[in-house]
Amino acid sequence: MMNESSTEKKNELSLSFAALGVVFGDIGTSPLYAFGQVIKYFPINDHNIYGILSLIFWSLIIIVSIKYLVIVFRADNDGEGGIIALAGLIRQKIKKPGGWLLFITLVGIGLIIGDGILTPAISILSAVEGLESLSPNLAKYVLPVTLIILFFLFKMQSIGTGKIGIYFAPVMLIWFITIGVLGFLQIIQNPKVLMAINPYYAIYFFMIHKYFALFILGGVFLVMTGGEALFADLGHFGKKAIRTGWFAVALPALLLCYFGQGAFVLMHIEYIKYPFFSLSPDWFLPVMIILATIATIIASQAIISAAFSILKQASLLNLIPRLKIIYTSKFEKGEVYLPLINFILALGTCSLVVIFKSSSNLADAYGIAVNLDMLITTVLVGIIAYYCWNWHAFKVMIFPLILVIELAFFAGNIPKLLTGGWIPILIAFLGFVVMYTWHCGFEKLRELHHRDALMDAFIIDELNQNKISRQSGMGLYIIDPYDCEGESLLHHLRLNRIFFENMIFVSIKIENKPYIPIEDKFELIKKAEGFYLIFIHYGFTENINLPNELDEMFKRVYLPFEIIKNKLIYFIEIVFVEMTRERQKHMYMWQKHLFSLMIRNAVPDIQFYRLPYNKTIAIGTYYQL
């Protein structure tokens, strides 16, 4: 028993260590720009610095430590976190939640795309700006160096991070130790800053500055950016590992660093442009700049990987068009590369760097997307607490209280809309338009399909009565997502009168759970003699490889005929959309054009399901929108 307990502790510690290189990268590099962004609006004096530090301290405690690590962590979907996991959890309990859940989910995914564009830009730019602390003459190199780093960062996505990923955790541990020590060295010179732990100073700050103090919350919020990643990465490391990493390493280091910056600016009012790099002795500054740059690259890698992961899940759930998914690791199933998304993120990130030119300017655009994502998380977890956990209404009242705090931060972020905050909102809006148009287009395809498929029921009767001649062999038909039970392919068979002696229709069902156990994966329905419908159930985080899945299926599902894999022929459907001027419900003409463009360029079934090219036949189906 002692050995087992010791082994478990070692595993937890190793997971906590690994989490440092992924989970805490974003929030761990916030000290580069967050504190400097806040203090530029106020005169440097004891009351202002103590008030700002008190707001930072209690924000990290209430929102990140209590809300996320204590409350939100309870809302895991079979160990998985993130907005899609939360939405899936609600759908398991509320079978028909209505359009509001779809709306929130699509907005949340759009915000994650915006975050994936903004985070690499502000993080790496803020690190490279350390060159100015070395010499003002180096300022002209900040932009080109940042762009070069970003170019190689996005270029390396196609080969994955498997080989260098093992170094992420050690680097981030060194980073946290370094910023913690540098902050501590300043605190011991001015220990009075520790009085800011008292919430009185945060309250007094509001009493002095009144409504203007609300504006400063937009800057204070920057210390929490990356906090949402703690929940999003839950499936990779687990609750205990992330909690241990946060409370043992990340949180103490961050607080020491922020309080150290506060102590420093009170003693050196003239060094307020880059208070973070001012903590470093001159002899250590070049090392600090290199370490900060590497840390921000790791933080950026984490958010890019998270964007790939969430959009892969959205693609499986048919919330967005099917994307080309490349698996970059044979061992880590979660490591994926999405070429189109990588190009969009790279283009957006580099454009923002060129347009805004400094991390201070970019900070105005940053934060709003994360703030909205946190608000959405609070709402969804509140619903889960009431409907899934059966919390009493009195206990659920904690969520409105958290919402009030987060809405106060959002109010502080609103003025940023005029100076760049509109960018993540625009990105999220464009993402929402694309996803909602895809949803509406598919709903229309389902409607048109069911209208035409009503007559196909008699084919089943004819097959049962042996009124239709059959040819020898077997065909395996892959059903498209808009088609529930393969009526569209049956319609094709009825037209050309080609019926195999044995036919298997395979329908892929993506469930509201991250993983489906193998014993629940397959469902067999006999439709007619020699004609079977098989449902294969996947979780929204699983990788789809249909030929491999079929091997397992044939072992577990009894069929009254022999399956010869080498002679198996796959049939897939390719949908073509012809636009008409007829006004469709919930779809304007521009949406028809957009949907037609997306369905033409979506990854075909043969790639998505990884079917063999030399044994796959495509059948075209036409619809008029």
Curated annotation (Swiss-Prot):
Keywords: Cell inner membrane, Cell membrane, Ion transport, Membrane, Potassium, Potassium transport, Symport, Transmembrane, Transmembrane helix, Transport
A single GO molecular function term of this UniProt record: symporter activity
Entries under Pfam families matching the protein: K_trans, K_trans_C
Domain of life: Bacteria
GO cellular component: plasma membrane
Catalytic activity: K(+)(in) + H(+)(in) = K(+)(out) + H(+)(out)
Transmembrane segments: 15-35, 52-72, 98-118, 134-154, 164-184, 203-223, 246-266, 284-304, 336-356, 365-385, 394-414, 417-437
Localisation per UniProt entry: Cell inner membrane
Main localization, broad class: membrane
Key word Cell membrane present: yes
Topology relative to the membrane: Multi-pass membrane protein
Similarity remark: Belongs to the HAK/KUP transporter (TC 2.A.72) family.
HAMAP family with a match to the protein in the record: Kup
Purpose of the protein: Transport of potassium into the cell. Likely operates as a K(+):H(+) symporter.
Protein name from the UniProt record: Probable potassium transport system protein Kup 2
Organism field: Legionella pneumophila subsp. pneumophila (strain Philadelphia 1 / ATCC 33152 / DSM 7513)
Name of the gene this protein is made from: kup2
